[in-house]
Amino acid sequence: MKFSTIPGLTEVKAMLIDSVKSNHIAHAQLFLGKEGALNLPLALAYTTYLHCQNKGETDSCGTCAACVKSLKFIHPDTNFVFPLSNIKGDKDEERFKAEMLKSWRQFLIEQPFGHLDDWTNFYGGEDKQAIISREGSREIIRSLSLKPFESKFKVMLIWQPEYMHPSAANGILKILEEPPPNTFFFLITNLAERLLPTILSRTQIIQVPLLSDPEVNEYLAKKQDLEETRRQKIVQQAEGDLNFAIKLIDSEEDHNQEIFTDWMRSCFKKDYASLVGLADNFHELDKMSQRNLLYYGQTMMRETLLHRAGATEINRATGNELKFIQDFSKVMTTSKIDKANQLMNEAGYHLERNGSAKMIFLDLSIQLSAVIK
């Protein structure tokens, strides 16, 4: 991957490039961003730039032998560690690892901005918990015991280290603190608080923000043939998550406004029979649609807050959405909105970790009923 394929993030890109030019590259770096931030693409572009044999001022050349391999994710001096579900079955261990590495490379090509759930769906492990096993830490140590094959540098990319088994995390502490010469660790995470403090203390943190709405809009305008009103709505719902924006384009026109209005009406009335039925309906949705509904709900909460504050110039709702917000703001105080947002965030977290959608949405509905009324 090249820096030029990643929209926005100008300051972070410049900092990474300058570190290579000045030869001040921290041996262990943690690319930290919320889910939806482009921290994995940045780490990949940084790795490509490190290996590039004909570096430009602002990007790798894309044509040298090293770049050709890096852009296919097959450079021999770039190693990957990533979460996997236990779907090996009776396959030989080496064969299974080879198959998963091949799938990983194809995933990066097809879904360069993908999330963890996209990855587990890609290789067929969506129904099982993905982890980085103890064997993963042994693989790191084995790989780094070898000298670089073609490049001056050797890079170990660890995606989602928060999913490391505790024994795996402890297993890499020594080599993380004292890596072999010209060896770099790039850890890519959404949840630094779930990492061992001893790992955090050994890394330089690179903060990767979500994209701004104009950056997402510019990318979609260049890459997708969309009617402007629909594009703006997608940008608003995506909230800086480019991967989510792309998925929204591929999905059918949603009916979230109608669904969310009915849901909040049932919460307000404390109509528990209706809420049970809605939880059943939400359970039948695919994971993308479930997540989309929660994102939409949080968007409506934000718009309601803006309406209450009188910030009509930045309130983006129109039509039926605006009417809903005008009515909703009569019963929702700032503290209620904050609490509802927190509850939706927690529900999204549990959905991402394969909790029962029916139980998650039913519990959320009951708690929202208590907040709203």
Tell where the protein language model's regions lie, with residue ranges.
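Charged, glycine-rich active-site and insertion segments that engage polyanionic ligands
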Residues: 1-51, 55-58, 65-69, 181-184, ...
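Clamp-loader machinery-focused feature within the broader ASCE/P-loop NTPase space
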Residues: 2-163, 167
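Conserved adenine-binding aromatic site and its adjacent loop/helix in ATP-hydrolyzing domains
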Residues: 142, 174, 201
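Conserved catalytic/switch belt of AAA+ P-loop NTPases
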Residues: 145, 170-181
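Structural recognition of the conserved hydrophobic beta-strand(s) that form the central parallel beta-sheet
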Residues: 155-159, 172, 183-189
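Conserved strand-to-helix beginnings and helix N-cap segments that scaffold or border functional pockets
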Residues: 166-170, 291
